[in-house]
Amino acid sequence: LAGLSAANYLHRKGVSVILYEAGNKIAGLAQSFHDTDGFTYDFGAHFITNRLAKKVGIEDKCRTVKHYAETVWLGGKSYSHPFGLMRVPRMTMSGFAAKFKGLTSKNKTETAADWFRAAYGEALADEVAIPLTEAWSGAKAADLSPAVGDGISNGIGRTLLLKMASRLTRRAVSCGYSRELPEKPSVYHVYPMGGIGTLCQKLAEGLDDVIKLESPVEKILVENGKAVGVRVNGKIQEASAVISTAPVNVLGKIVEGTDKLEHLTRFRYRPMIFVNLRLKGRGLLPDVVTWTPESEFPFFRLTETTLSMPWLAPEGKTVITVDIGCEKGDEFWQMDDEALGEMCVENLKAIIPDVRSRYLGCRVLKTPIAYPVFLREYEAERRALMEGTGVENLYSIGRNGEFSHIFMEDVHYRAEQKMKQHLNHLETIENIFTSSAPSTKNHLIAGLFDKDSNTAGKDKNIAVEVE
């Protein structure tokens, strides 16, 4: 999304754009898949905000999401999130104690575990927040930066306001999905007809003639501390700037001519497995999202998408997406689709007793790069990355490129802002191109290039982007 957002913005500003994509299709994981039985699967985000839809120009092609809520499954019971947990006495008392302690002492939070206990109290932190964090990150909370907590909560008052607005308007008001722009009752979730890929298709409009698929970027070239171009399919394209959306640990490997970014190769992303279960019936989970922090479950999150978007499955049927944290090559990663489906069904019996009789099959996605992991060991370097790459004319944008937990609206907004800043700093602009990184099929590279050049021109005014 970041690559297309950047290319689209530059194209609208009169800069010619060519898109080089390493894979055989654009949009990466921001795609929808439809099977012959009438089920739709979205890998990545399931919905966007109406504000983003209007901004991109697909507002009239979206359906309003009327309901969204989360629950936590704990001790065989379901608790609404966040307010249901507040009615558990031990969690309420522990939470008050933590707040009082915070007012009377100034203990520094050095780890994610410290942050959760200070924010929620020991009971909720130890039973819910910390186990969930460790499940999706694959790291101990004591080894994670307290920055994990950044942006998790809008605050009780703000959350209550947005939840009340959602009930009154009968729309899924955005709560915790936007950081760059304010969340308010008028900002709610919508689903593009045809799937989330509709957003990417709209951003790609007008770029058809310049999109080049199966064109991986092999190297980003740096000379005298400046990004000066890229090598694509063995050919060099000179550049005045490079805007990368590649995972930062990939960026650190493909930069040639400086060792300033070698430390980025230590940054970790959490691999994930998403198992989409097809089931008979609907309303099988307590609500749209059910978090499962207890160690008895091999998964940490369940999402029954049809409770928000009933059109994603045939009438009388549903899809439940099961999120499993893993590592490449581990037991889960090596399981085939049938085995993963069976494992999920077996472990869902505690929540859906008759799930076996409802099971119709599954579809599975495995991705080696799902979420950035904020380890303390490279926290200083991560914070430095927030200020820039340290290489002149080399920018890193997007969820993976910024190594940040941001959602689609923020990805789009931040990509455009970076492009705006870039154009403001260029005295002369003649062209742009976009292309893809070598390590994964989902990464893009974008840049400015001569309007009349073909694959490997010598134009100096070029910005490059990798997603």
Where are these regions (language model features)?
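N-terminal Rossmann-fold NAD(P) dinucleotide-binding loop
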Residues: G3
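Glycine-rich FAD pyrophosphate-binding loop
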Residues: H11-F33
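Mid-domain catalytic core of redox enzymes
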Residues: K13, S215-T321, G325-Q334, E338, ...
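Dinucleotide-binding Rossmann-like beta1-alpha1 core, especially the glycine-rich loop
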Residues: T36-K106, D150, N154
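Feature captures the FAD/FMN-dependent oxidoreductase FAD-binding
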Residues: L52-K66, T71-H81, Y120, L124-D126, ...
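Active-site/ligand-binding neighborhood in enzyme catalytic cores
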Residues: F100-K219, T245
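FAD-binding beta-loop-beta segment adjacent to the flavin cofactor pocket
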Residues: P310-E315, T367-S396
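A conserved FAD-binding loop/helix module that cradles the flavin
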Residues: G398-H422
